Amino acid sequence: MTVDRWTQLVRHQVGLGRLLPLGGPRDGAWITEEAAGAVLRRAAADGAPGVRLGALRIALADPRDVPEPVVPAPPSALPPGPLRVTADFAATAVEPLPTAASRLRLVLAGAATERLGLAVTEIDLRATDLLEPEVPEPDQPKPDLLESGQPESAAPAAGAPQPSPAREPVGTDGTAVTEAALAVPGVLRLTGSLGGPGRAVHIEEHSGAVALPRRHIRVELATDATHRAVDVARQVRAAVRDALPDHPTVAVLVTAVG
């Protein structure tokens, strides 16, 4: 691997942020902080008018209060436990800042629980700026028609950074895992973000102190925003486990919600 490619890979993985526990210790699922933050930002933009979200971080509320997950976690992932969201925000002066903060807190808590399945127990907000009141924009003229008589299509809106697409799996088991995961409702695609460029399915052996060696599989994927991320992850774990004759342990890492 060249120095430039290595630098690019490191920057990409740093951009993912923390790997946050999704659900509880028995769910065997994680989500990147980048993906979770994008969902919270969309929720704030849609559900908290007059408020603009700034810097946002998600971390364990109490690192001492964390149970062991039921499956091996992805490298450097946080253990399951209650989470704290810390964010800066700006708001207009049409209402007291504590009122704006309360509205934003409710929106963030709802999105974390209902759209993702994060166990958020604390949300710390800090007001950093005042915004000018929003002025309704005047009606815009209809778009010009093309020669075909159809209105010109607008450019697609810029969204959150998308993870690298996954390469084709190698081997029969990799193919079986891929097919099982993609068949689950709510899975948009497999991604390759954490374990090297394009690797979405990771198969390895784990041995405990008393148990015999057992295979462990990690699947990286993107979920549909209309499905709760933790519910999709649970179904993927079950589908992948049942797709292989040795019924390995399975962990799921959600790298995007779109």
Residue map of PLM features:
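N-terminal, Lys/Arg- and Ser/Thr-rich interaction peptides
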Residues: 1-24, 153
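N-proximal, solvent-exposed amphipathic alpha-helical segments enriched in charged/polar residues
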Residues: 17-73, 166-206
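Short, non-transmembrane amphipathic alpha-helical segments
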Residues: 40, 44, 96-116, 226-248
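Short edge beta-strands and adjacent turn/loop segments
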Residues: 49-90, 124, 128-130, 189-222, ...
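C-terminal interaction module
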Residues: 175-178, 183-190, 203-220, 224, ...
